[in-house]
């Protein structure tokens, strides 16, 4: 089993907080009920890009973990390869570990189930971990400088100017290693900047509402159609505004941000050298227990972009980044069918997800809330992040998961060159547009969207 963030292990001398361990407890309890079952936990693999390489290599070789965890967006990119068991029929069966349950699916929040649905209508992943994001800030630095958490982008820029003038790094923003912080930032900024254009991008002319499902407002097929029609284009000044705002912000990220990875960014923040850090609910327990922290911290929402900062701003609030993308996006390998153990693996997953087991498991980790109907006993520190997601997440994907993996890498390289002045906006967007169109063509071919081709030719 590959459990990702839930992977249990012992605390080592280098740990500054307790690692998760509760899955060991559940495994022992399960073995009492099923003595013949052997449960082996694979070591956790980080960062995300290294895990992606490892897991795809394992599946290609027919060695994917019997029970694994993987983001729904990645699973739904690769489900046609036959790596995963369709969980939909099993979700219709009773969960024997939940009293009175007649249908396993009924214990999960509707958004969790909807998030896991693949383009073919089946479910190859059960995404049950609710995660939220926020901007963590050093209350002591804010007090010394005399600033308050901002509500608008203009205020955000102004407090960073003052913090920088006081001799601190305003924002620990990593651009080495995992692309998460850039991805989250552009998801939020793009959603606000393109707010007035989303109905045209979707192709319906109707308002695009926010839900708890990431990027649900604009499907990948709708995005590809908009690219082919020139509606979603890197050469559109409204689209370009997200890059301009990101570059404006980058002046406050401190020297060497291109070589700063997420661990180094966290260390800048926790040691008091940087005033802010954009991260997920996963940092709450870590910051609370890290003995390097010698200050009070708080969390605020990503600031709203207004007309004061951009002519394209509609004043819509910033969306949340998160949803059902935390620990516990469960997958079952198709090889379990050949091994004759698929029913046992599903049974073990039913045991894990029973509320009396899942809530303590989540609290032990302290990073995410399970996507269950019954959340009695969940750590109250996670509630603000849950509420932020309930208010709605971003409606359209950014560079990282919107198109192809190749496009994400190409975009990121060009973005770095733009932020550091090696390319101007025109040069950067010319190149991005070329890569964007290539990715759109590849997705049309890969997914067999002949109807889209016919529509474009009409």
Which residues does each PLM region occupy?
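Conserved N-terminal structural module of periplasmic/extracytoplasmic solute-binding proteins
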Residues: 1-83, 92-103, 149, 427, ...
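Glycine-centered hinge/linker elements that transmit conformational signals in sensory
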Residues: 160-162, 198-259
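Short helix-initiation/N-cap motifs at beta->coil->alpha
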Residues: 44-54, 153-157, 257-271
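Hinge/lid segment of periplasmic solute-binding proteins
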Residues: 74-132, 148, 204-217, 300, ...
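Short amphipathic alpha-helical coupling segments at ligand-binding clamshell hinges
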Residues: 22, 26, 241-245, 339-352, ...
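Long, aromatic- and glycine/proline-rich binding clefts that accommodate carbohydrate-like moieties
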Residues: 300, 304, 311-316, 324, ...
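Paired acidic/hydrophobic, glycine-rich loop segments that form the ligand-binding mouth/hinge
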Residues: 66-69, 275-280
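Extracytoplasmic/periplasmic substrate-recognition and gating elements
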Residues: 3, 32, 144-145, 251, ...
């Amino acid at each position: 089993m590959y459990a990702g963030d839930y992977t249990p292990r012992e605390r080592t001398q280098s740990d500054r907080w307790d690692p998760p361990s509760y899955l060991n407890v559940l495994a022992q309890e399960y073995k009492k009920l099923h003595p013949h079952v052997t449960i082996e936990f694979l070591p956790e693999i980080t960062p995300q890009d290294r895990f992606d390489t490892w897991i795809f290599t394992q599946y290609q070789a027919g060695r994917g973990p019997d029970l694994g965890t993987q983001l729904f967006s990645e699973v739904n990119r690769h489900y046609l390869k036959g790596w995963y068991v369709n969980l939909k029929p099993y979700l219709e069966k009773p969960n024997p570990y939940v009293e009175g349950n007649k249908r396993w699916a009924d214990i999960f929040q509707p958004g969790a189930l909807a998030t896991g649905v693949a383009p073919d209508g089946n479910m190859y992943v059960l995404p049950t971990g609710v995660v939220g994001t926020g901007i963590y800030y050093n209350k002591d630095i804010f007090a010394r400088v005399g600033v308050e958490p901002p509500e608008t982008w203009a205020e955000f820029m102004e407090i960073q100017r003052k913090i920088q003038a006081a001799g601190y790094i305003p924002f620990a923003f990593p651009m080495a290693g995992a692309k998460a912080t850039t991805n989250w930032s552009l998801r939020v900024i793009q959603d606000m900047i393109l707010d007035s254009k989303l109905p045209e991008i979707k192709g319906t002319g109707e308002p695009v509402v926010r839900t708890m499902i990431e990027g649900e407002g604009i499907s990948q097929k709708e995005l590809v159609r908009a690219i082919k029609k020139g509606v979603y284009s890197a050469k559109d000044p409204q689209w370009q505004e997200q890059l301009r705002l990101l570059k404006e912000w980058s002046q406050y990220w401190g020297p060497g941000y291109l070589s700063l990875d997420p661990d180094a960014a966290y260390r800048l923040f926790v040691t008091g050298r940087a005033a802010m850090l954009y991260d997920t609910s996963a940092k709450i327990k870590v910051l609370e227990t890290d003995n390097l922290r010698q200050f009070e911290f708080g969390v605020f929402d990503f600031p709203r972009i207004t007309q004061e900062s951009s002519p394209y701003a509609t004043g819509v609030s910033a969306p949340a980044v998160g949803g059902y993308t935390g620990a516990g996006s469960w997958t079952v390998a198709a090889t379990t069918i050949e091994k004759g153990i698929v029913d046992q693996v599903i049974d073990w997953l039913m045991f894990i997800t029973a509320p009396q087991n899942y809530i303590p498991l989540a609290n032990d980790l302290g990073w995410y809330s399970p996507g269950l109907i019954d959340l009695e006993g969940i750590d109250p520190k996670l509630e603000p992040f849950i509420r932020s997601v309930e208010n709605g997440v971003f409606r359209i994907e950014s560079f990282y998961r919107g198109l192809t993996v190749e496009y994400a890498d190409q975009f990121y390289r060009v973005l770095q060159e733009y932020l550091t002045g090696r390319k101007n906006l025109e040069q950067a967007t010319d190149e991005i547009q070329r890569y964007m169109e290539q990715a759109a063509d590849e997705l049309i071919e890969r997914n067999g969207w002949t109807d889209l081709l016919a529509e474009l030719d009409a």
